[in-house]
């Protein structure tokens, strides 16, 4: 789609390419970076101790993830400098989602990733993206967790009260 993406990979010194290892994907909060998330969360220290690989992507649009249910009622004139991008109708067209999927595939090609142990963690806006990814593509994750950035209830349930889960 013509957009350039940036991400950070962390591979512990103990990595042995003959052995499958877990992958932990850390998603930063709004206006942060993947590298900042790596430092803030200390995932790299845990990766050294536990022997997994980390991936820290940057959100593509001015460090703000394209997430559902947060900015639909947002009026740009209320905060003209806030870099908001509304999500597309079809989740498969969401650049951030496609980037994360492509990065997972890239990591699986580049390293010996255990496909049954891919985890995602997000903080604040990264937690909202983690939930969005898990609800729509969670079949490829072993687990997802986050802190801050709660999800709106209308993103979790449809009009009949059934849980939305396309994974």
Regions found by a protein language model. Name each.
Residues 165-167:
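Catalytic His-Asp charge-relay segment
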Residues 161-162:
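Acidic (Asp/Glu)-rich catalytic clusters
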Residues 3-8, 19-115:
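Serine-hydrolase catalytic machinery in alpha/beta-hydrolase-like enzymes
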